[in-house]
Amino acid sequence: MVEEVVRRLDIPDGVDVQISGRSVRVKGPKGELSRELWYPDIEIKREDSKILIRSVARKKQHLAMVGTIAAHIKNMIRGVTDGFEYRMRVVYSHFPIQVKVADGKVAISNFLGERKPRFATIVGDVNVEVGKDEILIRGMDKEAVGQTMANIEQATRVRGFDVRIFQDGIYLVEKR
């Protein structure tokens, strides 16, 4: 007989979770997130104030996917209650890097003295605030916040120089 794998997640007060077919919708004080979560032989149900993620198959892939789906739902719940915030620091030695936000993009000017600005796209519904030497990235969707941070970091990647000497760029300092 095949054992089933079950993960239970508690739904905190003030959060509403709706599951219909493959889609999971989470509403909270900060807003609403919706996502398609599906894998064969895995079902997602809501029972009272808990979410059940159940797999009938006992294969490694199914065990892993039960944990993955549970982690996605936990991140959605955390996103609508607390949100995610990444703090980045602008580091330069000689040429002062200037950062501006406009039209869903982050414009990075004067990087290593370059005349042409570099651009990084802002993914999804993410808020980017630019300070003097600091950038704050806030949002409900962890993946969108992380991808925006990665886009900014990759836009200031040093190519063709020794990175031990040319340490200019925009780097992640803190995740909350």
Swiss-Prot record:
One of its GO terms (cellular component) is cytosolic large ribosomal subunit. InterPro entries: Ribosomal_uL6-like, Ribosomal_uL6-like_a/b-dom_sf, Ribosomal_uL6_a/b-dom, Ribosomal_uL6_arc, Ribosomal_uL6_CS2. GO terms for molecular function: rRNA binding; structural constituent of ribosome. It holds the Pfam family Ribosomal_L6. This protein binds to the 23S rRNA, and is important in its secondary structure. It is located near the subunit interface in the base of the L7/L12 stalk, and near the tRNA binding site of the peptidyltransferase center. Belongs to the universal ribosomal protein uL6 family. This is Large ribosomal subunit protein uL6. The gene is rpl6.
